């Protein structure tokens, strides 16, 4: 918990119980790409009395402070993940919503080449690749929203 206290203070945020609990849930392996609603449900399951409006407010504060990264994958629902030191891209299944993170040096190099060719110096980018799971009908997969 001390590390979370330090992280909040370093981000310029006051240490509060809702912020600590939300940060704790975001650090769980099963909550790598989580919506505000799913995070709220997890807090309820933990016996925490933190309202949905508070969850949204804290996630927006975390996004502004750089603690989380907001993604707007296909379907319009925002999902959040803890901001990571290493850059990665995402593969998203349009059927089940599964999100797979990947890194590929050749893709990164090609993006820099294209930007340079057009006179742009990249400072940031996001790559989302959408498709369908090769395993067939994955819509019933109960683990569909786990980040891998």
Curated annotation (Swiss-Prot):
Subunit comment: Homodimer.
> Which UniProt keywords are listed?
Cytoplasm, DNA-binding, Iron, Metal-binding, Nucleotide-binding, Phosphoprotein, Repressor, Transcription, Transcription regulation, Zinc
Region annotated Dimerization, chain positions: 85-148
Report the sequence similarity comment from the record. Answer: Belongs to the Fur family.
- Answer yes or no on keyword Transcription regulation: yes
What more the UniProt record tells us is: Activated by cadmium, cobalt, copper, and manganese ions, but not zinc ions.
Give the protein's function. Answer: Acts as a global negative controlling element, employing Fe(2+) as a cofactor to bind the operator of the repressed genes. Regulates the expression of several outer-membrane proteins including the iron transport operon.
Query: Encoded by which gene?
Result: fur
Under Gene Ontology molecular function, one entry of this record is: zinc ion binding
Residues modified to N(tele)-UMP-histidine: 118
Binding residues for Fe cation: 87, 89, 108, 125
DNA-binding is among the record's keywords: yes
Region DNA-binding: start and end of each range? Answer: 2-84
Q: Where does the chain bind Zn(2+)?
A: 33, 81, 90, 93, 96, 101
- Activity control: UMPylation of Fur by SelO/YdiU splits the Fur dimers into monomers. Fur loses its DNA binding activity and therefore its repressor activity, which induces the expression of genes involved in iron uptake.
UniProt-recorded name of the protein? Ferric uptake regulation protein
What about PTM? Can be UMPylated on His-118 by SelO/YdiU.
Q: Name one GO cellular component term.
A: cytosol
Record GO biological process:
negative regulation of DNA-templated transcription; negative regulation of siderophore biosynthetic process; positive regulation of DNA-templated transcription
Q: Which InterPro entries match?
A: FUR, Fur_C, WH-like_DNA-bd_sf, WH_DNA-bd_sf
